[in-house]
């Protein structure tokens, strides 16, 4: 019984401490430095749901199953030569494909290096330039997977004088003045690994949510969620935290990694941060939210009593002829009742323990009485034995007294008879014989 009580107490203590210790899963400190994109204060009422937004279109996973990064380069020209302004696509090339030259006129006349996506040299070569080639050229690099777009603009002017041929920077773009009929090279070099390398996709794209309770520095933050583009999802901490704080399943499909915290409590206050890492695309962003929980506005308990006479039958699903009682309890009350429930449950447990303890002590004391009674009983037996002895004695005594009442001679006779019966007779005979003589 005593052991059971101890066990119960231990269990109670363990339950309370587990809540504290399971919560402190450390966040990975080895994250590369992220750019803090935003710091926001968010306050929400207790019991409500808070949404901490964290969205980035660049984190959308395009599931490039071809293992081709969907990198593409295209050269366009903005020309005013024919009087009207027009934009024309000259050529393009995919990272895992051949280059396409759009007009037949340019076929064989303009070209890009075939190894552009391994070398990072996307420069355009135009042979036999004509006056009609004048215009603003743009080298466009698109990385569909990383949602990156880069453009380099170069202005090409044609001159008929060899002396006038030159290259300069006009403050916005490079300007090349080329001699008519010559071969020009419009430079577009980008050796950033994003444009030249291949990586394994899934491991490179990860989203973390961290939480710092008030007063805890960022390097000791608790990790809440890790989410990988491959679909792997890791949640940390006790189950109630995992159920309470979650991000949607479609996060990588929509680029929405917003954290939803349901049933806000005061204990949920703290600093939350969303880390978006796209290692391949070089994206490292951090969004910070300070969450404050405010007391809900005190609602008055509303008891709405409506008799069936006055109740308007708007909803056909509602059963008619019943009194409708709407009882609205403010959420703070619900919280209060929860707390009360906890307190009562704990109290009940202690009462049970107390009863057990009282029971044990009572049992012990009872055992003590029995022991004493047994001793008494033994003594009684002794006393009985003694009384038996004394009665015997009195019997003897009363006999003696009876003997005293009798004649002394008789007594003597009796004594003599008792001690020497045969001899007495002999002596008597002898005495009589002597007397008769
Ligand atoms: C957020 O709240 C903190 C503490 O109350 C305050 O110091 C800070 O100025 C607030 N920041 C913003 C952006 O409101
Ligand atoms: C890029 O390629 C063009 C054409 O092949 C070449 O003329 C140029 O030197 C290259 N540039 C670099 C920086 O390698
Ligand atoms: C979090 O949300 C996802 C998708 O909505 C769900 O599959 C998962 O079970 C949730 N996690 C917990 C611990 O409730
Ligand atoms: C009471 O309930 C009725 C319908 O059930 C509604 O029309 C009315 O507005 C309610 N009154 C209050 C004070 O909530």
Curated annotation (Swiss-Prot):
A Pfam family per the record: V-set
Swiss-Prot/TrEMBL keywords: Cell adhesion, Cell membrane, Disulfide bond, Glycoprotein, Immunoglobulin domain, Membrane, Repeat, Signal, Transmembrane, Transmembrane helix
SUPFAM superfamilies, per the entry: Immunoglobulin
Residues of the signal peptide: 1-22
PROSITE patterns the UniProt entry points to: IG_LIKE
Ig-like V-type domain boundaries: 32-159, 167-294
Annotated glycosylation sites: 41, 121, 246, 304
The name this protein goes by in its record: Matrix remodeling-associated protein 8
Source organism: Gallus gallus
Lineage, highest ranks first: Eukaryota, Metazoa, Chordata, Craniata, Vertebrata
Annotated gene: MXRA8
